[in-house]
Amino acid sequence: MSGMGENTSDPSRAETRKRKECPDQLGPSPKRNTEKRNREQENKYIEELAELIFANFNDIDNFNFKPDKCAILKETVKQIRQIKEQEKAAAANIDEVQKSDVSSTGQGVIDKDALGPMMLEALDGFFFVVNLEGNVVFVSENVTQYLRYNQEELMNKSVYSILHVGDHTEFVKNLLPKSIVNGGSWSGEPPRRNSHTFNCRMLVKPLPDSEEEGHDNQEAHQKYETMQCFAVSQPKSIKEEGEDLQSCLICVARRVPMKERPVLPSSESFTTRQDLQGKITSLDTSTMRAAMKPGWEDLVRRCIQKFHAQHEGESVSYAKRHHHEVLRQGLAFSQIYRFSLSDGTLVAAQTKSKLIRSQTTNEPQLVISLHMLHREQNVCVMNPDLTGQTMGKPLNPISSNSPAHQALCSGNPGQDMTLSSNINFPINGPKEQMGMPMGRFGGSGGMNHVSGMQATTPQGSNYALKMNSPSQSSPGMNPGQPTSMLSPRHRMSPGVAGSPRIPPSQFSPAGSLHSPVGVCSSTGNSHSYTNSSLNALQALSEGHGVSLGSSLASPDLKMGNLQNSPVNMNPPPLSKMGSLDSKDCFGLYGEPSEGTTGQAESSCHPGEQKETNDPNLPPAVSSERADGQSRLHDSKGQTKLLQLLTTKSDQMEPSPLASSLSDTNKDSTGSLPGSGSTHGTSLKEKHKILHRLLQDSSSPVDLAKLTAEATGKDLSQESSSTAPGSEVTIKQEPVSPKKKENALLRYLLDKDDTKDIGLPEITPKLERLDSKTDPASNTKLIAMKTEKEEMSFEPGDQPGSELDNLEEILDDLQNSQLPQLFPDTRPGAPAGSVDKQAIINDLMQLTAENSPVTPVGAQKTALRISQSTFNNPRPGQLGRLLPNQNLPLDITLQSPTGAGPFPPIRNSSPYSVIPQPGMMGNQGMIGNQGNLGNSSTGMIGNSASRPTMPSGEWAPQSSAVRVTCAATTSAMNRPVQGGMIRNPAASIPMRPSSQPGQRQTLQSQVMNIGPSELEMNMGGPQYSQQQAPPNQTAPWPESILPIDQASFASQNRQPFGSSPDDLLCPHPAAESPSDEGALLDQLYLALRNFDGLEEIDRALGIPELVSQSQAVDPEQFSSQDSNIMLEQKAPVFPQQYASQAQMAQGSYSPMQDPNFHTMGQRPSYATLRMQPRPGLRPTGLVQNQPNQLRLQLQHRLQAQQNRQPLMNQISNVSNVNLTLRPGVPTQAPINAQMLAQRQREILNQHLRQRQMHQQQQVQQRTLMMRGQGLNMTPSMVAPSGMPATMSNPRIPQANAQQFPFPPNYGISQQPDPGFTGATTPQSPLMSPRMAHTQSPMMQQSQANPAYQAPSDINGWAQGNMGGNSMFSQQSPPHFGQQANTSMYSNNMNINVSMATNTGGMSSMNQMTGQISMTSVTSVPTSGLSSMGPEQVNDPALRGGNLFPNQLPGMDMIKQEGDTTRKYC
């Protein structure tokens, strides 16, 4: 073997070597050479033989060593014998198929006659051949098993006679050659055989009894079987029996396995046309016919009946109310209404209608309505209610801010549910209730999902939900969200246990639906419960889970339970959120308000439910819900419902816990078991709640009401009364929802002090409060609870437990894919953009920074993290889900109050605050965004009705947010616009419907404003907001725009301080809760009406502050917030954007205007920053109002720009680039620098020439704006570019940039470096960091990199400084950079105010920088300057407390954050 070993590897080489060496070594011995050669050859062949033998037998182990020749030969002989024996056996049995391991012999050929039957027998389908004409040439006999047709019936018939119409095209593609059918799916070469697999629906032969029926009936009864066809097209060369089979399609059709069956669309829809009187003129059900879902005729019939029927407690039917809305707004979404089919299937429906006008005369001609239906199908009815698509659109308005809505749009049942909830509030229109639910539910924004996820978490299904929508429910983002998660538990328990109509499977589906479904499930279950208050009561008594589930019957109790239950660690906020979420689900549908709906809603939020029952909008929803649910409940039996509630509630209870949420979240069924783990505590909680409920509702009358509700009597009102009623059930005054609303608001305000109390205290107190207050009050209380708890959570009253819950939630979020799906969603975004630790740290920081603003500050921080993330995502959702759904926002406005009180405070405390003055409605709208999202939605929904709830809603929100106060009022008006901001075009229509007062500017603000900015604005802008509460809805829309509107929202200051008090003296979380409560109470009283707000503003000197220092304040806050936001979340743009907007806003006394201005100016910035989310395009929100001013400003700016065309072009280009390619940096920083430098020189010359003139103009305009107040500023704020922005979200930025750039030029003139900065802004658009460095002014002003950071944050800020285009940014950078320099600081302040004023006028902005230096120095500048440095020094401020006096600090913070960002 030695020879073999030596040479086998390369015998040829060995032989050559041997020839050369042999003569020398061995001598001339031919014999020896021959022997060696033979040996080598022998070794070689044996080795090859070994390889063949062992390789053939896959005896790989034998390759590890070299076998000896004997072994190899032995194995070879053995194998040859085996082969011969096998051949003999095969010869004996010719028909026997050869063994697979025998490869040496030829394949056995099966006789063709035997092969056919064998194949057919083995086939899992039938075989058919279709020729080029589409005729069936052959079909196998077994077709009868599948289609009931005989072979003879199909032979030589057209295949299209049995194919569904919708599949003809696909079949033709497969039948005809690629050359004939363009875009054919064949991928193989034409001459080769091609195979393809496709699905098609084939007609099943009708049964004999149906053949006699008429054609129509027969068509209706047609049944199609979805078959999977494997088709092979034969090449031309194949001919058989003279027949050309070249174009034949040979197919094998088999039934699609259940697991492979495509998921049927979760929603169905049909369209109707109505005349202007609302009478149906035509009905189109073709889409439902094509869907082939059984019972669609009954579905259409019952939907129309439900929509047009007048329900108890309602003055008009859904159809009538909706028709009026359509005629008024041009586009409207109805509230979600529910009904049941003849088979008991629950259906959630929503109608979207559009007014069609004549193209020539523009006169209304008719109304086209799309009715979207979602069947329950063993899932929580809420899911059907939500009908991913059906609810999605309506929800979109609300949901536009909320991932839940997005989910809904996506059509996930779970998500649908959540969306449904959201919509309910906007649709329900109970301002308080709706807004609140929105706030809580939508307030969740991302939280919405959180609540959905977390709420669903309790339900086994719900957790599955969570898997789908973790980002939605990012709990970390919203400490209050954890409550939301708990709330889902509530839902879960009703869904799983409490809803006879909706069996656990329902919940399971809900769970699978996703977190939103969880919410929906909750609602669905709630419905079950709602039908009987008694059941709900019992459920509550039986367990927290039930309380959540049965919270339908007693939302308040549910809240209480959540709070009481172990889940309460974080649950107090979660409870609130959950309660809201649960209610939201129902609220969305609005039906819960009635009967089952009432209970469901009540379970979610007592107050809210009441609101639903309120005459506003909820009644309709509630009645529907009550109808559908009551039917289900009645059909299944109250007893069963009660049993479900009692039994499942225990299981579900644990789910409220954060851990339970996480666990349940992980598996949809897990929720039940998870809740089971918490069963003991939940039982205790249940008993406590029941005890309290009994105590609170000690009167037999209350119990009787509950019983009546349980029995389905007076369900709507009673359920709402009982629903809040576990605790407040009895006390609820179902009869007077409005009164309750006010009472609830009052109660919330009065109980505001609990807000600051530690979470543990708050939970019981809130619970108690809930029980004590009226149903409306309960709802408010719940909202308050949420907010208070959230507040306390934010401040870190219970950092340990809250953090634990938060961590769990964050884990869930991080583990789920939702964050990826909804990176922008509040919950998801926080999880995605900021790691869990960062969020927790922020939360801790908030608690640690218990500065006067702590409640707000903490909230802000949390919001900054969660809301900013949420906000950004939400706008994205809004844009994606509800781009054209301004109407939904309007709908949302109907229930602004609901949102107001929501936890959003903690979630997006700034947002929350904003909605407060605006109304809960605002929050309702902004709710999705977080609080802001809810607010926004609520505002939109309640915009029109908002006057009715203003003070009440404000009060609750104010108390809840504590900082919101009057300022939010105007915000609320604007939320509609903000809500529409997602869909700028739609936004504008929306705005009219909400409130004339609402600033379109606001929308613009909303669009531009990022969560961070919103938060930042909480400080200074608060005043502005408050100053213009009536008109200044703009700030709310900002909030609503979860986009990067934080900055804008910050303008409002609302988010920051609900009350002027907060603004003036930062609402210190440090202050005792009682003090804060007292302040809130006072604020509530003061803000009860707009006059009071205005008086307060005047007393506080807010108008002056707003015009002067506030502008700066907002900027500072904006910068800080922006910085924080940037630090916390990936998108730097929001910060930059926010900071700039904030400055502008801050300077503008009117928040709207500043917001608008910021939007206008910032749009380019926003665009730059918004690259990651071009959908935000805040400028698109700018409305027509400011058009004149904007146009004037634009003309001025353009005139100036004409001198500097290059710069202007660049700015425009940058904006355009951002818009077109948001992800791509606009231009290289170097280019921007070069341009900036050149333009700086040119512009400096022009500016110096015009400097004095421009400054004078700017000053005059600033004064004018201040004098005019916020009303004027919005129009002014909206530059000409802005209006364009409003109309076209993408263009707006370019327009805004256009406008801002002229100001930039002006600013450029002012400071040389600044001007470079102006060019730089263009560069920052492309490369903010470059912009900073490029802008000498910026760098100079901020000698330290910190300033550059603001510049980075305000990448444009420098540019703005250079060119007043972005006053807010410019001024904030100055402040931040030169916080120490009082002159600069002053300059910045003036700049800010001027910026806001010149927001609409670029030229003014240009001068602003210069003028600012001179005039702004006067008031806030010096103060701000000093403040700025101080705050900058305080890292805590950076973290969470960005208050009015922190503007410079904010800038500094921005600088720090930006610098870090820049230089990292």
Curated annotation (Swiss-Prot):
Keywords: Acetylation, Activator, Biological rhythms, Isopeptide bond, Methylation, Nucleus, Phosphoprotein, Repeat, Transcription, Transcription regulation, Ubl conjugation. Residues 1-11, 468-486, 657-681, 992-1003, 1022-1034 have a biased composition (Polar residues). InterPro entries: bHLH_dom (IPR011598), bHLH_NCOA1-3 (IPR056193), HLH_DNA-bd_sf (IPR036638), NCO_DUF1518 (IPR010011), NCOA2/3_DUF4927 (IPR032565), NCOA2_bHLH (IPR028822), Nuc_rcpt_coact (IPR009110), Nuc_rcpt_coact_Ncoa-typ (IPR014920). It is found in: Nucleus. A motif (LXXLL motif 1) lies at residues 641-645. Residues 26-83 form the bHLH domain. Residues 691-743 are annotated as: CASP8AP2-binding. A motif (LXXLL motif 4) lies at residues 878-882. GO terms for cellular component: chromatin; cytoplasm; nuclear body; nucleoplasm; nucleus; protein-containing complex; RNA polymerase II transcription regulator complex; transcription regulator complex. The modification Asymmetric dimethylarginine is found at residues 338, 864, 874, 1173, 1177, 1190, 1196, 1203, 1221, 1240, 1266. Residues 638-648 have a biased composition (Low complexity). The keyword Flavoprotein does not apply. Contains four Leu-Xaa-Xaa-Leu-Leu (LXXLL) motifs. The LXXLL motifs are essential for the association with nuclear receptors and are, at least in part, functionally redundant. The LLXXLXXXL motif is involved in transcriptional coactivation and CREBBP/CBP binding. Present in a complex containing NCOA3, IKKA, IKKB, IKBKG and CREBBP. Present in a complex containing CARM1 and EP300/P300. Interacts (via C-terminus) with CREBBP. Interacts (via LXXLL 1, 2 and 3 motifs) with RORA (via AF-2 motif). Interacts (via LXXLL 1, 2 and 3 motifs) with RORC (via AF-2 motif). Interacts with APEX1. Interacts with BMAL1. Interacts with CARM1. Interacts with CASP8AP2. Interacts with CLOCK. Interacts with DDX5. Interacts with ESR1. Interacts with HIF1A. Interacts with NCOA1. Interacts with NR4A1/Nur77. Interacts with NR4A3; potentiates the activity of the NR4A3. This is Nuclear receptor coactivator 2.
